[in-house]
A protein has these predicted regions:
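Cofactor-binding beta-sheet edge motifs in enzyme active sites
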Residues: 1-368
């Protein structure tokens, strides 16, 4: 659903019903906007719809409260889809630069990682490498003022999608340069038993057999950490080289998230992350021209369809000796990387920009 809010002002008290992920932040924003004591502002969040980061800010709630105070009557504000694209925040554009080296036996010898404007969530190196540096430029995942021409905000696992895509793509490039299987290469450089466990579990469930990339099988692997949760995903894709299109056929995802309070809910979150991840990996992109937003509805801003959904297998590993960790975002962070690595395995072409649109895939195929 789009952003919506209903506001009612009664004397020096305000009640606002809003679709928001941040009710206390909304309360404070509304109080400042209409000059009320925050203790006299009540925000009610109906149990409906989803946010995925987009409902973090509260412009529609502030707008409704201002109007209600002005006219002296309850006011409802509901954005159209076009207004949603225009007024809402965007996931920040980012650039990642990586320099890395391997020794004579293929071992990682150094790692120099710089991320600009995506923040450092997901950037720390968890592979064993003797010489490494990770630097994040910009303020958090929004960058310093003036970094972006439009408002930026959270998008499910803010920044980690970008950082995991960059790191896991580079790890696959290093494995290929070393002449080693990408799963075996990762295991060779992992010392954390939690990550080793999820990767081995995913590979076993998938039925992975070692092969140097590109094996032409269309298999990809990626690992990540988010919100204290360890995740490893393996995917199989088919690429139409002529059209530059990708069909994700199968995804196996193993996740270790401490003690799991609601296993069915955790499984559904993993599946939702995988499906949603198809979008940022393959199609979701906003185009601008002369300060104008060209994509204002789903006719040009393509999100995943039911017909895109692959066979999905999820494995939740028990870790009852550890406290509960995040379950709503980790599985999405690896989707860009696992699909990119599968495309490279299928075709030998490496796509280094998200989303991996048909034009970008064909360009990568053309350049080899």
């Amino acid at each position: 659903e789009t952003h919506a809010a209903v506001a009612r002002i009664e004397g020096d008290k305000a009640t606002v019903w809003a679709s928001t992920q941040n009710p206390f932040g909304a309360r404070d924003e509304i109080a400042r906007a209409i000059g009320f004591d925050p203790r006299n502002v009540r925000v009610i969040t109906p149990f409906v719809g989803g946010g995925f980061g987009g409902k973090t800010f509260n412009l529609q709630a502030v707008e409704a409260a201002r109007l209600a105070k002005s006219v002296g009557r309850p006011v409802q504000v509901m954005w159209s889809r076009e207004e949603e694209f225009f007024h809402d925040t965007f996931r920040p554009a980012a650039i990642v630069k990586i320099k890395s080296g391997i020794g004579t036996a293929g071992e990682m010898t150094f790692w120099d990682y710089e991320v600009f404007y995506a923040g450092d969530r997901g950037a720390p190196q968890f592979y064993t490498v003797p010489n490494h540096r990770t630097a994040s430029h910009g303020s958090g995942w929004q960058g310093p003022p003036g970094s972006h021409p439009f408002g930026t905000g959270a998008w499910r696992a803010p920044g980690n999608n970008t950082n995991t895509f960059a790191r896991e793509s580079q790890i696959d490039l290093m494995a290929a340069a070393a002449g080693l299987d990408p799963v075996e290469y990762r295991l060779k450089h992992l010392s954390d038993p939690r990550m080793v466990r999820v990767l081995k579990t995913a590979a076993e469930r998938f039925g992975w057999t070692p092969a140097k990339a590109p094996s032409r099988r269309g298999y990809g692997v990626a690992c990540g950490i988010d919100a204290g949760t360890y995740v490893a995903t393996i995917a199989e894709v088919a690429v139409d080289a002529g059209k530059g299109t990708v069909q994700v056929k199968r995804v196996v995802c193993a996740q270790e998230m401490g003690v799991v309070i609601n296993p069915q809910g955790a499984k559904l979150q993993m599946e939702g992350c995988i499906v949603m991840g198809l979008g940022y990996a393959l199609t979701e992109e906003i185009h601008f021209q002369g300060g104008r937003i060209l994509d204002t509805n789903y006719d040009t801003y393509r999100i995943p369809r039911f017909s895109w959904v692959p066979t999905i297998e999820t494995i939740i590993l028990e870790a009852n000796d550890l406290p509960p960790q995040g379950g709503g975002e980790p599985a999405i962070v690896v989707m860009g990387a696992v699909i990119a690595n599968a495309i490279a395995d299928a075709t030998g072409a490496r796509v280094l920009q998200l989303p991996m649109t048909p034009d970008r895939i064909k360009a990568a195929l053309h350049t080899g």
